[in-house]
Amino acid sequence: MAQTQGTKRKVCYYYDGDVGNYYYGQGHPMKPHRIRMTHNLLLNYGLYRKMEIYRPHKANAEEMTKYHSDDYIKFLRSIRPDNMSEYSKQMQRFNVGEDCPVFDGLFEFCQLSTGGSVASAVKLNKQQTDIAVNWAGGLHHAKKSEASGFCYVNDIVLAILELLKYHQRVLYIDIDIHHGDGVEEAFYTTDRVMTVSFHKYGEYFPGTGDLRDIGAGKGKYYAVNYPLRDGIDDESYEAIFKPVMSKVMEMFQPSAVVLQCGSDSLSGDRLGCFNLTIKGHAKCVEFVKSFNLPMLMLGGGGYTIRNVARCWTYETAVALDTEIPNELPYNDYFEYFGPDFKLHISPSNMTNQNTNEYLEKIKQRLFENLRMLPHAPGVQMQAIPEDAIPEESGDEDEEDPDKRISICSSDKRIACEEEFSDSDEEGEGGRKNSSNFKKAKRVKTEDEKEKDPEEKKEVTEEEKTKEEKQEAKGVKEEVKLA
């Protein structure tokens, strides 16, 4: 499969300002506030100018039950801290209460996480972006009818199901320190999704992900597990990740990739025991990106929150092919990053218990399994189901300028690099406003026009022919989940 180096690709990014308000409870290691810290840091690096930012819709119960059981989702919708006593049996049944506590806004939190991942998949399916990013997603432990490992709704599975409407084969890669058990379980018997997980194994949550777990039935050899020991460093990780992923790409030939970027595999993580730096972790993103496939990047674990924000900010920059300085810009959470106030972290002096012999032995075993794969299974072409979410609204230039827009619409209006300066103020006019935005938007250089031959044409409803409308409603012939 062809690789490209340094190719600029269109990136869209999903974020809701409310996500940082959710709180698992005192002493709980999972802190949604880390998503807000990440967002604030990448804003202050100016990365917002280089990508489209969207506020996700709140995924509804119908979307979630494309994978999860009806009674489990109904339970998540109903449970609250003030009515827990009425649901004690169901809490036990659905594994909610300890690692996965009941907290205020639990279901809304799941809606935002899931909404961003599903919307990202729809964007990729419509070829409206090359890379989609949702750092609030990546909750890989959730099962069909059970919460697990701080995860309630498996946004990854739901996003992959959406991708499968348009893509014959989807590759899932997991670089979280914990095994991606929930995603593997969901696709264990299909040959249309390959799951690849690099994780700590042996007396460590969730206890799954043995080298010998390879899938079943049609899915035999489509689950790939690389069990690791404590202390793996950048050099060792790169030495296994690149050859394994190259072989996977060659044998499976996916047409879309989902990369779970759990940052608990970093050195110094509160719950982790690996020794990766941010650069080492991001090399995985860079390598997967080089295959030039539609890519969904998701969050996941990460419990030293200052390093989570550093890591996901840097990996957003990698997706954008943008260099950012090691000196952190001033931001709302600047004091979290002391005493050095730098982007990158140093590895610790912990021992790497993964010897070269051990890593080579596991790698060769995985290669043997991958050689058992038939080359790129074919899939029957079928009419595709409709998208999970409706079309985005039309051109803002056609809107009534006297009508106040919603916060959601406002969040989608992102300044491109050439449109605004670093400052929030433009000359004597003070703050940026909608009319300035529109004027700037209309100004296009000849260069840009050459780069963007498929420039959107402004078309009014009256100009659309009935024939075009009929065509838009037509059923596309594409693949359907077998």
Curated annotation (Swiss-Prot):
EC number: 3.5.1.98, 3.5.1.-
Regulation of activity: Inositol tetraphosphate (1D-myo-inositol 1,4,5,6-tetrakisphosphate) may act as an intermolecular glue between HDAC1 and N-Cor repressor complex components.
Modification N6-acetyllysine, positions: K74, K220
Reaction(s) catalysed (UniProt annotation): N(6)-acetyl-L-lysyl-[histone] + H2O = L-lysyl-[histone] + acetate; N(6)-acetyl-L-lysyl-[protein] + H2O = L-lysyl-[protein] + acetate; N(6)-(2E)-butenoyl-L-lysyl-[protein] + H2O = (2E)-2-butenoate + L-lysyl-[protein]; N(6)-[(S)-lactoyl]-L-lysyl-[protein] + H2O = (S)-lactate + L-lysyl-[protein]
Residues reported to bind Zn(2+): D176, H178, D264
Cross-link Glycyl lysine isopeptide (Lys-Gly) (interchain with G-Cter in SUMO2) mapped to chain: K74, K438, K444, K456, K457, K473, K476, K480
Active site, per annotation: H141
Keyword ATP-binding: no
Keywords: Acetylation, Biological rhythms, Chromatin regulator, Hydrolase, Isopeptide bond, Metal-binding, Methylation, Nucleus, Phosphoprotein, Repressor, S-nitrosylation, Transcription, Transcription regulation, Ubl conjugation, Zinc
Name assigned to this protein: Histone deacetylase 1
